């Protein structure tokens, strides 16, 4: 029998932490504020833009939010935006609404509007992720979708998620009309050192830990190396636990982090193109 990379019995864990988001979300003041605002925003069916540096947990936070909604009263649609043409984006939205797209963008828009109207009291929530990749043509079609008043009633709730470069796109004059229709902006911040410690403890407790597995000096190094980005915090903590497990040590040390940092982070070297 092969030994698992992380021995749960060694650390007193019921599951392996940091592989997936914990069942109970980590909510510091910034993230709780965002969740509360999204709840109010969804009630009035508007457009929201959530931004932040890569790895700060934007998508996970919106996922927690949508999972908290009641399926009978909400229809959740999720799209990760690549370098779509405008019509490709409309086709993807049609698929989410179980519509057959047509060649004409104007007719496709009209069909989407009618389908949204037919949903009646059901609140459609369209989550558009990776919006920093969206073309100006795609943003223009979203503007057209937002511009329709559907008989003076807002029928679509849209949450757009992207890195800070997405805000740069919205700031362009060509996208001013769409920008003005966004009723809620929020930039998710990376964690400070204290929040990093709280986050690590939260994830470990959710995995069944009842004692300190990552001491303060290791927490500080994890924060310094990750810059407070949750994705990197997870990567470093998971790798450090695996290193401790290999040595059959029941807690992470600074040495474990120094062992793994060169393998899980981009090496600082001079690149030539």
Segments from the language model and where they lie:
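Short regulatory helix/loop adjacent to the ATP-binding pocket of P-loop NTPases
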Residues: 66, 166-181
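Conserved AAA+ ATPase "SRH/arginine-finger" region at the nucleotide-binding site
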Residues: 79-82, 170, 183-196
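Conserved small helical "lid"/interfacial subdomain of P-loop NTPases
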Residues: 188-215
């Amino acid at each position: 029998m092969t030994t698992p990379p992380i021995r749960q019995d060694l650390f007193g864990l019921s599951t392996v932490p940091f592989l997936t988001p914990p069942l109970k979300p980590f909510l510091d003041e910034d993230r709780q504020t965002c969740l509360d605002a999204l709840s109010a925003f969804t009630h009035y069916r508007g457009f929201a833009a959530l931004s932040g540096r890569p790895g700060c947990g934007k998508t996970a936070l919106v996922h927690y939010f949508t999972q908290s909604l009641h399926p009978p009263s909400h229809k959740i649609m999720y799209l990760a935006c690549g370098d779509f043409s405008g019509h490709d984006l409309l086709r993807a939205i049609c698929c989410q609404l179980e519509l057959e797209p047509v060649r004409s963008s104007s007719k496709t828009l009209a069909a989407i509007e009618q389908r949204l109207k037919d949903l009646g009291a059901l609140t459609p929530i369209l989550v558009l992720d990776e919006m920093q990749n969206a073309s100006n043509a795609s943003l223009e079609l979203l503007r057209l979708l937002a511009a329709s008043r559907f008989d003076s009633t807002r029928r679509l709730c849209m949450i757009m998620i992207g890195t800070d470069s997405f805000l740069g796109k919205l700031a362009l004059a060509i996208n001013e009309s769409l920008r003005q229709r966004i009723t809620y902006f929020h930039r998710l911040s990376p964690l400070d050192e204290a929040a990093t410690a709280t986050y690590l403890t939260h994830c470990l407790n959710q995995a069944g830990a009842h004692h300190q597995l990552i001491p303060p000096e290791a927490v500080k190094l994890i924060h310094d190396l990750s810059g407070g980005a949750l994705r990197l915090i997870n990567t470093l903590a998971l790798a450090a636990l695996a290193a401790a497990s290999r040595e059959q040590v029941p807690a992470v040390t600074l040495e474990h982090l120094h062992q793994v940092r060169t393998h899980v982070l981009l090496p600082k070297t001079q690149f030539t193109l």
